[in-house]
């Protein structure tokens, strides 16, 4: 095949929320397109009007916007190969259906669903193919006059692809190598239905990919059984020379590895399988990665490594690094276990990598939920001290709320273990020392307090544990003088005074 511009597409159906497996497929297409200086097309495959769900298309677009996957052309992006919504391409498909009929590559069939059911009951393992089409009601067994008369009457029909029997069909897959399937196992697939004047997925898919000059079809493994049919359709149209290359991606498996990942797995184990929260008209809300507190960069990095190996030990990588390293030939043939705990690990890594200012911005709504207003500089400082302890932004409140709200009570176990008989006396003395500190920096405080402890001959651990309890309310937190420095002298003294009054 002559060298041509890389053009790939992601073509979801607007039938509901976008599954995380679909996100990975779109991501691999995006990485492949960017690496080769090519185009990524966004197409909507809405030929099945019965399954259309209002809001699904907008949901899919919003998901990619959040994730940072950008399209070059398509629905809502424009381009020279539109329209990009299949329901708007009816006349185009009709033209190509007629080409197949005129060239004896397809035929019209009038069999009703009831007649087909009767045949299935009569013949074991019945399929509509070269061995059975001669006993059915179609344009191969009827005269042209009979066919024309039925169509004129408004009789509903389908157009079926005429597959020649016993032919080896070769599919060259960039991941799996050559796949050979004998055409005898294929049925004469329905390509077009007169009832809604729309093609089925198979015809629309091939026609669109050809007219939109798609060079590579990168899609899920579930489409591999359809690949021979698609190859035969390209041949039937005489498009062998421009047929795209295929790559069928491995399935995303349940965390245990036994079967395909489903929404039920997420419900069972407590992780999302959709990029964004999904609120269908039925009212059943499904959680999303965004609303669950995942950073988009973490989701992208996590998904990229489910079925692809960059060839080194690097795990955390930016989108630019992934574009540079991505190699479709390094995608696995076998399914990838969906290790949702690894997704949490990635989120932790990206929280550490993000500037404190960005994390602080994300933490502000959490503070607001708890009725806290604080100077942004203080939030930035606290985030910098505490973000290494969390995997999600919302968890910051659990580990650092004491920076913003004085303890209303004191942890019973910590009091029993850390508050000694002389703790009230020692804390009263320490408060006087702290009140006199002029340099209230971390280092300034530490020098004065540690000198005082040494001078008094007190046990350092006992003093610092009691000091922590007065400021935090329990035995957790970062370095003691980091806490008092962030709180400031006035708040530190106020908390110490209250603790002594409550605990003495």
Curated annotation (Swiss-Prot):
Identify the Pfam families for this entry: Anticodon_2 (PF19269), tRNA-synt_1c (PF00749)
Molecular function per GO: ATP binding; glutamate-tRNA ligase activity; tRNA binding; zinc ion binding
InterPro entries associated with the record: aa-tRNA-synth_I_cd-bd (IPR045462), aa-tRNA-synth_I_codon-bd_sub2 (IPR020751), aa-tRNA-synth_I_CS (IPR001412), aa_tRNA-synth_I_cd-bd_sf (IPR008925), Glu-tRNA-ligase_bac/mito (IPR004527), Glu/Gln-tRNA-synth (IPR000924), Glu/Gln-tRNA-synth_Ib_cat-dom (IPR020058), GluQ/Sye (IPR049940)
Listed GO biological process terms: glutamyl-tRNA aminoacylation
Q: Which GO terms describe its cellular component?
A: cytosol
Motif 'KMSKS' region per UniProt: ranges: 260-264
Q: Is tRNA-binding tagged as a keyword? A: no
Question: Where in this protein would one find the motif 'HIGH' region, according to its record?
Answer: 12-22
Any idea which UniProt keywords this protein has? Aminoacyl-tRNA synthetase, ATP-binding, Cytoplasm, Ligase, Nucleotide-binding, Protein biosynthesis
What reaction does this enzyme carry out catalytically?
tRNA(Glu) + L-glutamate + ATP = L-glutamyl-tRNA(Glu) + AMP + diphosphate
Enzyme category, top tier: ligase
Q: Known PROSITE patterns for this protein?
A: AA_TRNA_LIGASE_I
Q: Which EC number applies?
A: 6.1.1.17
Keyword Cytoplasm included in the entry's annotation: yes
Positions binding ATP in this chain are 263
Subcellular location, record wording: Cytoplasm
Q: Which family does the similarity line name? A: Belongs to the class-I aminoacyl-tRNA synthetase family. Glutamate--tRNA ligase type 1 subfamily.
Report the function annotation for this chain: Catalyzes the attachment of glutamate to tRNA(Glu) in a two-step reaction: glutamate is first activated by ATP to form Glu-AMP and then transferred to the acceptor end of tRNA(Glu).
Quaternary structure and interacting proteins, as annotated: Monomer.
Q: Which PANTHER family match?
A: GLUTAMATE--TRNA LIGASE, GLUTAMATE--TRNA LIGASE, MITOCHONDRIAL-RELATED
What is the protein name given in its UniProt record?
Glutamate--tRNA ligase
Q: Which organism is it from?
A: Bacteroides thetaiotaomicron (strain ATCC 29148 / DSM 2079 / JCM 5827 / CCUG 10774 / NCTC 10582 / VPI-5482 / E50)
């Amino acid at each position: 095949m002559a060298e041509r511009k890389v053009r790939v597409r992601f073509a979801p159906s607007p039938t509901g929320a976008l599954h995380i497996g679909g996100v990975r497929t779109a991501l691999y297409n995006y990485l492949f397109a960017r690496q080769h200086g090519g185009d990524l097309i966004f197409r909507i495959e809405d030929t099945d009007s019965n399954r259309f769900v209002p809001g699904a298309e907008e949901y899919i677009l919003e998901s990619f916007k959040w994730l940072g996957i950008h399209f070059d052309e398509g629905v809502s992006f424009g381009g020279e190969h539109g329209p990009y919504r299949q329901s708007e391409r009816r006349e185009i498909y009709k033209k190509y259906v007629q080409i197949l009929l005129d060239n004896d590559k397809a035929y019209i069939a009038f069999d009703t669903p009831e007649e087909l059911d009767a045949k299935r009951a009569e013949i074991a393992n019945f399929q509509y193919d070269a061995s059975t089409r001669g006993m059915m009601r179609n344009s191969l067994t009827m005269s042209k006059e009979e066919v024309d008369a039925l169509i004129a009457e408004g009789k509903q029909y389908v157009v079926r692809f005429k597959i020649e029997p016993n032919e080896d069909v070769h599919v060259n897959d960039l991941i799996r190598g050559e796949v050979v399937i004998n055409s005898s196992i294929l049925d004469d697939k329905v390509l077009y239905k007169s009832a809604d004047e729309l093609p089925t997925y198979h015809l629309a898919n091939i026609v669109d990919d050809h007219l939109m000059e798609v060079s590579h079809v990168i899609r899920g493994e579930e489409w591999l059984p359809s690949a021979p049919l698609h190859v035969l359709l390209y041949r039937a149209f005489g498009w062998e020379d421009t047929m795209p290359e295929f790559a069928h991606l491995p399935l995303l498996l349940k965390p245990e590895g036994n079967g395909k990942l489903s929404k039920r797995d997420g419900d069972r184990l407590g992780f999302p399988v959709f990029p964004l929260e999904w609120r269908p008209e039925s009212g059943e809300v499904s959680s999303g990665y965004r609303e669950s507190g995942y950073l988009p960069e973490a989701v992208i990095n996590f998904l990229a490594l489910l079925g692809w190996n960059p060839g080194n030990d690097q795990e955390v990588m930016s989108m630019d690094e992934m574009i540079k390293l991505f190699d479709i030939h390094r995608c696995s043939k076998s399914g990838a276990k969906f290790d949702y705990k690894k997704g949490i690990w990635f989120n932790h890594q990206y929280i550490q990598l993000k500037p404190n200012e960005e994390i602080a911005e994300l933490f502000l709504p959490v503070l607001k939920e708890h009725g806290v207003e604080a100077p942004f500089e203080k939030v930035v400082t606290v985030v910098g001290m505490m973000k290494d302890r969390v995997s999600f932004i919302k968890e910051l409140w659990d580990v650092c709320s004491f920076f913003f709200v004085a303890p209303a009570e004191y942890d019973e176990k910590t009091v029993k273990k850390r508050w000694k008989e002389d703790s009230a006396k020692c804390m009263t003395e320490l408060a006087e020392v702290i009140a006199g500190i002029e340099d209230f920096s971390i280092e300034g405080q530490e020098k004065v307090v540690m000198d005082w402890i040494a001078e008094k001959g007190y046990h350092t651990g006992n003093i610092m544990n009691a000091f922590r309890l007065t400021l935090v309310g329990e035995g957790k937190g970062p370095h003691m003088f980091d806490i008092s420095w962030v709180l400031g002298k006035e708040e530190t003294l106020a908390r110490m005074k209250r603790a002594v009054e409550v605990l003495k």
